[in-house]
Amino acid sequence: MRFSQATVLAFAALSLAAPAFEADNKNIKREDCDKTSFHGHHKHKRAVAYDYAYVTVTVDGNGNPITTVSPVLSIETIAKSEETSSTSTSISSTTTIVQNDSLTSDEPKTLSLPSGTIKPSSFATESQSQSQSSSTGGSGSGSTNGIEGDLAAFEDPTEEFEDGVLSCSDFPSGQGVIPLDHLGFGGWSGIENSDGSTGGNCKEGSYCSYACQSGMSKTQWPEDQPSNGVSIGGLLCKNGKLYKSSTRSNYLCEWGVKKANVVNKLSETVAICRTDYPGTENMVIPTVVGGGSTSVITVVDQSTYYTWRGGATSAQYYVNNAGVSWEDGCVWGTPGSGVGNWAPLNFGAGYANGIAYLSLIPNPNNRDSLNFKVKIVGESGSTVSGSCSYANGKFNGNSDDGCTVGVTSGEADFVLYN
């Protein structure tokens, strides 16, 4: 039995978004995100967005599926029997994994935050509250090497976050947490307020989401999520102080699975923007890869990461054209801007049952081609099943439907090249 690739794409249209003000003369518009808005999620829900489900199944040597997959929506299945130049592999058991995009198919009118479910370990005394704990890294003005973060690749954080110490007006930089000051939220990646609005400052009753350096994910989201499908993530502002919203970790950031990197063979920098999920679903979390450089990229362990309505979720990324800065590219874009949710290409990355699934995904918002090519290749000594490449708006030569590989051992690279 040979492991091959079958990709299922399910598209469900979402609602439109209105632009705010223009940031510069490059047809890039930046949203007025520091103001609150009564909207189901981020007030600038991505225009004409889709829900993706990528399913990889085991097939026999003739490309016939061994398992039966029951998709939820109208689907198109593309089954291919391919091998990459790296070592081929045989898999003795059936492998089925769904990689869901972070979007929901409905946009609720109001944001329903969970109540009565946050159980911080204890409230700090007044004297404790007045002291800055070194474990939090202080406010957004602390030294964190900017969006690069303060940890070396796969260096674990060492200082735990303490409930009830930092004020809600402070941002917990450091230990993997990076500030996104350009968004206007005081360093936070997004704010979900108790009155159903999003944006503004981290204030009483709000869930304040944060970004982690590339290769890491935030650990904090309440177990009790709204029944309307909206996702909630981040720290809780309670009695003027910040508290963890989950007991799953005492650290705010955790590393993904060491399975993928981005190798930039171009001369220009490329900004790759992860959706803030669970949370406001902004595509604002940057992985920035300079020309001639390499960066780790987050591959989430789907057995331990956030689940949406019982289903596993993967990391999803928007890939901007080379030369677009991360400040301009990792935002909610507008039609014709070609940035943010209008960037031409998506990456997907998840890990389950010993296999990392890495995907190149078309963005139906923008069918224009990137100004560079992408291929997923196994590193030396790695085992990768399937092949996946993108050039001139097409996948694996002439397909419009994206592609996925399975990394069963070692690591693979998203290679960016001319």
Swiss-Prot record:
Name of the molecule in the record: Secreted beta-glucosidase SUN41
Posttranslational mods: Predicted to be a substrate for cleavage by KEX2.
Family per similarity comment: Belongs to the SUN family.
Job description of the protein: Cell surface beta-glucosidase involved in cytokinesis, cell wall biogenesis, adhesion to host tissue, and biofilm formation; thus playing an important role in the host-pathogen interaction. Has hydrolytic activity on linear (1->3)-beta-D-glucans such as laminaribiose and other laminarioligosaccharides.
UniProt entry keywords in alphabetical sequence: Carbohydrate metabolism, Cell wall, Cell wall biogenesis/degradation, Glycoprotein, Glycosidase, Hydrolase, Polysaccharide degradation, Secreted, Signal, Virulence
Taxonomic lineage of the native organism: Eukaryota, Fungi, Dikarya, Ascomycota, Saccharomycotina
Localization per record: Secreted, Cell wall; Secreted
Positions of the UniProt region annotated as Disordered: 81-150
